[in-house]
Amino acid sequence: MASLWSEAHPTSLPGALWRLYLVRAALRHTIENSRVLFQEGVDQLNTIDQVVAGAPDPLDTKGLEKVLDDVLRGAFSGDLAQALERAAAIARAISAGSLHYSWINERDAHDLATRSLNWSIIARELSTSATTAREGKLS
């Protein structure tokens, strides 16, 4: 099912679900690295993303994973816009953490910059989807 969503417009319901799936897959495959990059991003940003993400200090990825799993299984009973905004906040922090990571070197710089850009794009699309969902127009 997720592969059908991959071509959907970013601010459609299938497109938003695809982006949630991507965030979930990335967290599942790189839990510790994602936690470190998230915390590095939170340390660098002067935003409320950690609060919006609903993340304790340090980040507990299990809570976000459960929300994303519930949304993707259709078992989520909460506010979809809030879930989208939380995932966007996580993505923004990981994006920032990828650029500011303390051990960055020339060999890793290109990959981390690309990863940061990808997370930034996903964050923006999820935020836009959250706004669209709040307006009742996410379809």
Question: Where are these predicted regions, by residue range?
Answer:
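Short secondary-structure junctions and interdomain/linker hinges
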Residues: 8-13, 27-34, 74-82, 94-101, ...
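Conserved binding-pocket/active-site segment within a compact domain
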Residues: 44-108
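Non-transmembrane, amphipathic alpha-helical segments
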Residues: 4-5, 79, 111
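Long, charge-patterned amphipathic interaction tracts in eukaryotic proteins
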Residues: 3-67
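Alpha-helical oligomerization segments
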Residues: 96-139
